């Protein structure tokens, strides 16, 4: 919204700063951060008053039983902060902004309904897996179709392989939709599975969003994208504003979500943030880079699939407990040790992902 102030730069030279993406990206992060910090205490009080306490699974780690009753659905604060900040600092004429907000809020609505059922019926399982998959699939397919339609040229419909500048595979509409679906739905569920310890998913989301913000800015800048041999995606620079808003909102939320957590983001936050990250990766054509930078999310999801699949086949478990962060808890790691060590791993993975900008 503030972008329109740049039109009055002829009257007041200083207003010209509002046309710069970098300035608006920084301000989007600070605005979302301030919003989360300002309304965090109020949100926690309201959730507590509404008795929106987390129902902890009795078959999980016994150390988690003390978390029973901790307010959940705090992700609604994150989504509100992202939406407000993006609308304030983003370009409303950019279709990517509306697609991202649409995906964020649509999957957030699913998560909200899931959390609501858990709170009202005291059922840790929430909505059925079938209902959740149908909703996520619908959002991913609609977003994929919209992004394919917006593709200005064939360069926006290719599969980029990191570290190899000569490998770029054309996808076509079917391939594009399949890849978009897997990326958006897969990341949404992976982040949700990761959100099992205080702050475990929140800070990695910040790191991955920051990394994708850099890719978005570069991809939306013709000279930079050509120099780094990345596909030029017109308008993708505005996506960086959405990403930095996500960074700020999650950092502000982490203030209250750090151990011992005063509030959990719940499915309303985790499902939405994951889907948004996946959508950003599709826009900038960096699905494989997302797999690298979000390696923690991938490992968490794969650990669950391996555990379930192997148990169904052999009635034995690969891990002491899945997702894998619970495995390390069962091995004797403190919750804070698991969280910080997984953060460190994510920092390394994001740096590796950023190295693909130049190493080709």
Swiss-Prot record:
It is found in: Cell inner membrane. GO terms for cellular component: plasma membrane. GO terms for molecular function: metal ion binding; phospho-N-acetylmuramoyl-pentapeptide-transferase activity; UDP-N-acetylmuramoyl-L-alanyl-D-glutamyl-meso-2,6-diaminopimelyl-D-alanyl-D-alanine:undecaprenyl-phosphate transferase activity. Pathway: Cell wall biogenesis; peptidoglycan biosynthesis. Keywords: Cell cycle, Cell division, Cell inner membrane, Cell membrane, Cell shape, Cell wall biogenesis/degradation, Magnesium, Membrane, Metal-binding, Peptidoglycan synthesis, Transferase, Transmembrane, Transmembrane helix. Catalyzes the initial step of the lipid cycle reactions in the biosynthesis of the cell wall peptidoglycan: transfers peptidoglycan precursor phospho-MurNAc-pentapeptide from UDP-MurNAc-pentapeptide onto the lipid carrier undecaprenyl phosphate, yielding undecaprenyl-pyrophosphoryl-MurNAc-pentapeptide, known as lipid I. This is Phospho-N-acetylmuramoyl-pentapeptide-transferase. It comes from Neisseria meningitidis serogroup C (strain 053442). The lineage of its organism: Bacteria, Pseudomonadati, Pseudomonadota, Betaproteobacteria, Neisseriales.
